[in-house]
A protein has these predicted regions:
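Generic marker of "main functional regions" within proteins
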Residues: 11-12, 40, 44, 50, ...
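Short, basic, helix/turn surface patches
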Residues: 2-12, 21-25, 68-79, 89-98
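Catalytic beta-strand/loop cores that center a nucleophilic Ser/Cys/Thr
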Residues: 81-187
Length: 187
C-alpha cells in the first residue's frame, strides 16, 4: 500500500487508470484508514477493484438470485455465440458497448454531494459496467430505467439491464466514507 502514514482526516482519490494505489484487491490498510475516519473517492473503472470486497459496500449484484440469473443468461449467450458468423463479430460487440451516452440521473438533492442541483443531472456515461444500489449509505445519483438514456449510443443489452443503478453514492464505513462515482462527473 503506501509507505507513509496518512492522517484519518485526509482524503484519497482513486481515479480511472490510477492502478499504482490498488493493484488487485484493496489492501486491509486502506479499509482500516477509511474505518478510522478517512474519505476515499473512487471514480470510473477504478470501482471494479472494490466490487465484492468486504467493508467497501460495493456489490456486483443486488442479491444471490440476481447473480445466479446473470450467470444463466451469460451461459445462454455463450451457447448462442457458437453459431455466429465471423463477419458479424464487430456488430455483435456493439450490443454490449457504450460509446458515450448522455443519461438522465435522478438525484437526491438533499444530500451534500448533489446540493444545489435540480432533481436530475445529465451525465456522460462511458463505462458499460452497471452497479446495484448501495445497501448501506446513500444512493445520491441513480440511473432509473432504460428511458434514462437521452442521447448517444448504448448497446441494447446494456440498456435493458438499467434498473436502479448507482451513478454516485456514499458508503458509510464506521468513522469514514467511501464515495463512488461511476463515470466522470465533469460533463
Amino acid at each position: 500500500f503506501l509507505k507513509t502514514t496518512i492522517p484519518a482526516n485526509s482524503q484519497i482519490k482513486k481515479e480511472t487508470g490510477a492502478s499504482q494505489l490498488v493493484n488487485s484487491a484493496p489492501p486491509k490498510e486502506l479499509l482500516d484508514w477509511v474505518n478510522d475516519g478517512g474519505r476515499l473517492i473512487v471514480i470510473g473503472s477504478a470501482m471494479k477493484k472494490f466490487v465484492d470486497q468486504k467493508g467497501f459496500g460495493l456489490n456486483a449484484y443486488e442479491s444471490e438470485s440476481a447473480k445466479k440469473d446473470a450467470k444463466k443468461n451469460l451461459e445462454k449467450e455463450r451457447l448462442k455465440e457458437r453459431n455466429r458468423k465471423y463477419g458479424e463479430r464487430k456488430r455483435d460487440k456493439l450490443k454490449n458497448s457504450v460509446y458515450g451516452s448522455i443519461v438522465k440521473v435522478n438525484l437526491d438533492n438533499s444530500h451534500p454531494l448533489a446540493f444545489g442541483y435540480k432533481e436530475y443531472y445529465h451525465n456522460l456515461k462511458l463505462e458499460k459496467t452497471l452497479y446495484p444500489l448501495l445497501s448501506k449509505g446513500w444512493n445520491v445519483g441513480i440511473l432509473k430505467d432504460p428511458s434514462s438514456v437521452v442521447a448517444g449510443f448504448m448497446g441494447y443489452k446494456i440498456k435493458k439491464r438499467i434498473k436502479n443503478n448507482l451513478i454516485f453514492g456514499v458508503h458509510d464505513a464506521k468513522k469514514g466514507k467511501v464515495i463512488y462515482i461511476s463515470d466522470n462527473i465533469l460533463f
